[in-house]
Design a protein with these regions (language model features):
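Transmembrane alpha-helix termini and helix-breaking/packing motifs in multi-pass membrane transporters
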Residues: 38-43, 96-105, 164-184, 256-257
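C-terminal transmembrane bundle of multi-pass solute transporters/carriers
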Residues: 63-67, 74, 78-80, 84-90, ...
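Helix-loop junctions at membrane interfaces in 12-TM secondary transporters
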Residues: 97-119, 309-322
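Substrate-agnostic recognition of the 12-TM MFS/MFS-like secondary transporter fold
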Residues: 16-36, 55-72, 76-91, 115-173, ...
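Juxtamembrane intracellular "pre-TM" segments in multi-pass secondary transporters
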Residues: 1-15, 201-235
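Helix-loop junctions on the cytosolic side of multi-pass membrane transporters
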Residues: 102, 134-136, 140, 178, ...
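A single, central transmembrane helix in multi-pass transporters
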Residues: 31-35, 176-183, 222-278
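MFS-fold secondary transporters
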Residues: 41, 94-99, 123, 196, ...
């Protein structure tokens, strides 16, 4: 194997399967969220309903995050990932049914909404376990020496699928409707399940058998609070995202303000991932190693300016750029 070979990780069959699996999961999940946001706002025309969607996902995702990390450390990663993908498949099937006109024709709008919220809540639970499981499995698929290369490929696939998922969702809603768009999501989850069968069961490395869960969680929290750099970066990022995120409002902008339809909504939803992917490429050539703190503050300031610009804009292309 050549030194500094950019394709070194791709020479491992299981890693290629892993990339396909991750693409299917991220593509399907991001597409599903777009479809559901559009459907819920179309049903209610109430901004609060979009806030409830976010709340239903974030509550289980955050409340279970530390607990999920502890469980992932204790369990076999492939088997746990299988359960996560199976859970996602069940959620996709449920949303597929509750967007199917013949199935929901006798249900009230409120019943449909509550059912969608329920499946979104289950999705938050699955996501809490899915993230740490994916990263833990990646570390077991490739040798340690090429892990940085594998992580780069994995991150690139994540960014690409994050861009394509929303974009495809927007066009598919317009072309084939919400229900059949959900069938694509269901197909992605089933494909991921099949792909996972090509990855062998991995051993549990250094399991901390019998370690109390509260002790494990306390250790993780203590590490974060004792590391001022990590704590500061996490806090700054959390505040910016918590008070500045406009993503949840995009269906309102797409339907009522910009009037760009589902295709425009998909483009708007994909725009942040496009920006993140471009910055990933830039950072590969211009590493942010010097004055990282000041650069982070500058990025947060620029983020705020973009949010203000987006909020004031009534021009579609300017909103996409923001």
């Amino acid at each position: 194997m050549k030194k500094n070979d950019p394709y070194s990780a791709l020479r491992y069959k299981e890693f290629n399967v892993f990339l396909l699996l991750r693409f299917a999961m991220v593509f399907g999940w991001s597409m599903q969220f777009i479809v559901i946001e559009w459907e819920v706002y179309s049903l209610t025309k109430n901004p609060l309903s979009l806030g409830i969607i976010g709340l239903m996902e974030v509550i289980p995702a955050i409340s279970m995050a530390l607990f999920a990390g502890h469980i992932v450390d204790q369990k076999e990663k492939r088997g746990l990932l299988f359960k996560c993908i199976l859970g996602f498949s069940i959620i996709s099937l449920g949303l597929f049914l509750f967007t199917w006109p013949p199935f929901i024709k006798d249900f009230s709008t409120q019943t449909i909404l509550y059912s969608i919220y329920f499946f979104v809540f289950l999705g938050g639970l699955v996501r809490a376990f899915l993230g740490p499981t994916i990263f833990s499995l990646l570390a077991l698929i490739v040798p340690k020496k090429i892990y940085p290369n594998a992580a780069t490929w994995s991150s690139s696939v994540w960014q690409i699928s994050s861009v394509l998922g929303p974009a495809v969702a927007g066009f598919s809603i317009n072309w084939i409707g919400v229900h059949w768009s959900m069938s694509i999501v269901l197909g992605c989850s089933l494909f991921a399940l099949i792909a996972l069968t090509q990855i062998a069961t991995k051993p549990i490395l250094n399991p901390k058998i019998g370690e109390p869960i509260m002790e494990s969680l306390k250790e993780g929290v203590k590490f974060v609070f004792n590391n001022k750099t990590i704590l500061g970066a996490l806090s700054l990022d959390m505040i910016a995202v918590l008070f500045g995120g406009a993503v949840a409002l995009l269906p309102i902008f797409a339907q009522d303000i910009l009037k760009v339809g589902p295709q425009g909504f998909g483009v708007l939803r994909a725009a942040p991932a496009v920006g993140a992917f471009l910055m990933l490429i830039i950072s590969a050539y211009i590493p942010f190693t010097k004055n990282a703190g000041m650069k982070l503050l500058s990025a947060i300031f620029a983020f705020g300016i973009c949010i203000i610009d987006f909020g004031l804009s009534s021009i579609s292309w300017l909103s996409v750029v923001a």
